[in-house]
A protein has these predicted regions:
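Cytosolic regulatory regions of ion transport systems
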Residues: 1-217
Length: 217
C-alpha cells in the first residue's frame, strides 16, 4: 500500500499519483463534508485524467446528486449510495435469516466470490447454454458489450460478441468453459405451490438517517 498526502481537489496534487494508469478510482464520502466534496474531487479527477476508460466509483448520499453525476459524466462515474445499500441489506437480512451470511461470503475472500469472465465460446449462444457450460462455477448473469448488466436474464437471451458472464466460483481460475451440455435432468419438475403472503411483525429499535430506507425496503 502506497500513500500520498495532499488535497484531492487540487489537480497538482492529483498529478503526483499517476491516476490515469489506475484500474479504477474510489472516492469516499467524508463524514463531515458530504456530497459536495465528493463532486468536487470527481471534477478534479476528470480534469487530470487522460484515460477515457477509467471508471470512477463515488460514494454519495443524495439520490439526485448520484443520478446527475452519472449522467453528466456519460456513465464514467458509478455512484454508490452506501447508506441506502446498508439499509436495504439490513431490512432484507431481518426478513430472511441467513442472507447476511451469504452476502458476507460473496464479498470476502474466504468462500466463493463473484467474477466477471470473457467467454468467446459462448458468443451467439443463449443464457440457458451458459448456465450449463461451467462445471465449477454458477452463472448468475451477463454484462453485455454496451456495459449493461443483467442478473438472471431470460433463458432465451442471446449472448453477443464482447459480452461477459457473471459467475459465482471459488476463484477466478474456476470459471472455466467446459462446453454446453445437452443433458437435461430426467426428473419431473414439481408443480409450484400456491404462495400466500402473510403479515410480518418486525420491531425497529432506535432511529437514524437510514430508518426511512429500512422501512421502505
Amino acid at each position: 500500500v502506497i500513500t500520498r498526502t495532499g488535497d484531492p481537489m487540487n489537480p497538482n496534487d492529483l498529478g503526483r499519483v499517476n491516476l490515469s494508469n489506475a484500474k479504477s478510482i474510489i472516492v469516499l464520502d467524508s463524514d463531515d463534508s458530504g456530497d459536495a466534496t465528493v463532486v468536487s474531487i470527481v471534477l478534479a479527477v476528470k480534469a487530470v485524467n487522460t484515460n477515457p476508460n477509467l471508471k470512477i466509483i463515488a460514494e454519495l448520499d443524495d439520490a439526485n446528486t448520484a443520478e446527475a453525476l452519472s449522467t453528466a459524466t456519460n456513465g464514467q462515474v458509478i455512484a454508490v449510495r452506501s447508506h441506502d445499500v446498508i439499509a436495504r441489506v439490513t431490512a432484507q437480512a431481518s426478513r430472511q435469516p441467513g442472507l447476511a451470511a451469504v452476502t458476507l461470503d460473496l464479498l470476502d475472500f474466504d468462500g466463493d466470490e463473484i467474477y466477471f469472465q470473457d467467454v468467446p465460446a459462448l458468443t451467439g449462444k443463449t443464457y440457458r447454454d451458459a448456465l450449463l457450460a461451467f462445471n465449477d462455477a454458477s452463472v448468475i448473469g451477463l454484462v453485455h458489450a454496451n456495459g449493461n448488466t443483467e442478473l438472471n436474464p431470460k433463458h432465451t437471451t442471446k449472448i453477443g460478441a464482447g459480452a461477459r458472464v457473471i459467475a459465482v466460483a471459488e476463484d477466478d481460475d474456476k470459471v472455466v468453459y467446459t462446453g454446453v451440455s445437452d443433458v437435461v435432468a430426467n426428473k419431473k419438475i414439481p408443480t409450484p405451490k400456491a404462495f400466500t403472503r402473510k403479515a410480518e411483525h418486525l420491531l425497529v429499535i432506535g432511529w437514524s438517517s437510514m430508518g426511512r430506507s429500512v422501512l421502505t425496503e
